[in-house]
Curated annotation (Swiss-Prot):
The keyword Ribosomal protein applies. GO terms for cellular component: mitochondrial inner membrane; mitochondrial small ribosomal subunit; mitochondrion. PANTHER family: MITOCHONDRIAL 28S RIBOSOMAL PROTEIN S28, SMALL RIBOSOMAL SUBUNIT PROTEIN MS35. One of its GO terms (biological process) is mitochondrial translation. It comes from Mus musculus. InterPro entries: Ribosomal_mS35_mit, Ribosomal_mS35_mt. Pfam families: MRP-S28. This is Small ribosomal subunit protein mS35. Signal peptide: none annotated. Residues 24-63 are annotated as: Disordered. The gene is Mrps35.
Length: 320
């Protein structure tokens, strides 16, 4: 039985068996190809830096074409050995190349005499002679009552813009506007502290819009709205009494009616012809009495106002 099994095994594996040995030493890996180093002749040539623009400039070049408008300092466009900065260890101040101090301050390289002359020549066609009739400030204020104030700023920085430059101030005297007594009082009530009673000047300042032109249009719009609103009369304004008035008005008041009735009775007793209402209001005694009463009501009582009121009553009643 064992001999038969051995013969069968030999028939299945006819060749001799070879035992494989195990080793702890790893076989060396195949060498990898490293990066190929190009030779100096095969390397691309670096592009040389171009010389500064200032070295190519001619001495008789057109400078307004180089610096046409206001702009930060450009070292490559200014052929001047400009230096600025604090010298380190008593050395030479910093040159213009890469100097941030020159960028902080404003420059006027665009305002050369030649550039200013060209600007004046270009604007000359749009300029007219000053009107001969406007030979005084009073006439200018009469024909041009609205005054517009704006401001331009020069900032120390790379930007030539300033947010404060967009503010616009409009000034106008209320006496130059076509306003009656009611419209003037209502406009003063609407504007509040923007009106100066001592100078009779209304001041409107606008700075909400990002552009100066927009703020100018907004200021003119506000003035237009205030003017038209002041002329409107609401229903509740007609029902106001003397106690509701912000300022005492003598016309059509109880004081005026009392004075007229008293004077009419006195004149009727003296003569048979009674004067008219307009004649009594036009006399000097009634006008002085009116001024004293208005001053006493609006400004309050004091020794001077009471003394003036006393004298006006004496003259009105022929007691002086």
């Amino acid at each position: 039985m064992a001999a038969a099994a051995l013969q069968l095994r030999q028939s299945l594996c006819p060749g001799p068996r070879v035992l494989r040995t195990f080793s702890s030493v790893a076989s060396p890996a195949a060498p990898r190809a490293g990066p190929r180093t190009a030779s100096r002749s095969e390397r691309p040539m670096r592009r040389k830096a171009l010389p500064p623009r200032t070295e190519k400039m001619d001495t008789d070049q057109d400078w307004p074409s180089v610096y046409p408008t206001a702009a930060p300092f450009k070292p490559s466009a200014v052929p001047l050995p400009v230096r600025m900065g604090y010298p380190v260890k008593k050395g030479v101040p910093m040159a213009k190349e890469g100097n941030l101090e020159l960028l902080k301050i404003p420059n006027f390289l665009h305002l050369t005499p030649v550039a200013i002359k060209r600007h004046c020549a270009a604007l000359k066609d749009f300029c007219t002679e000053w009107p001969a009739a406007l030979d005084s400030d009073e006439k200018c204020e009469e024909h041009f009552p609205v005054e517009i104030d704006t401001a331009d700023y020069v900032s120390s920085g790379p930007s030539i813009r300033n947010p404060k430059a967009r503010a616009v101030t409009l000034r106008v005297k209320l006496s130059s506007l076509n306003l009656d007594n009611h419209a003037k009082k209502k406009l003063i009530k609407l504007v509040g502290e923007r009106y100066c009673k001592a100078t009779d000047v209304l001041t409107i300042t606008t700075d909400r819009c990002p552009l100066k032109r927009q703020n100018y249009d907004y200021a003119v719009y506000l003035l237009t709205v205030l003017y038209h609103e002041s002329w409107k009369t609401e229903d509740w304004e007609n029902s106001k009494t003397e106690e509701d008035m912000d300022e005492y008005v003598w016309a059509k008041s109880s004081s005026e009616n009392s004075v007229l009735q008293t004077l009419l009775q006195m004149r009727a007793a003296e003569s048979s012809v009674a004067p008219s209402r307009e004649e009594l209001l036009g006399t000097k005694e009634v006008e002085d009495y009116q001024k004293c009463v208005v001053r006493l009501k609006n400004e309050g009582e004091n020794e001077a106002s009471l003394a003036q009121y006393k004298e006006s009553v004496k003259r009105l009643l022929n007691l002086a």
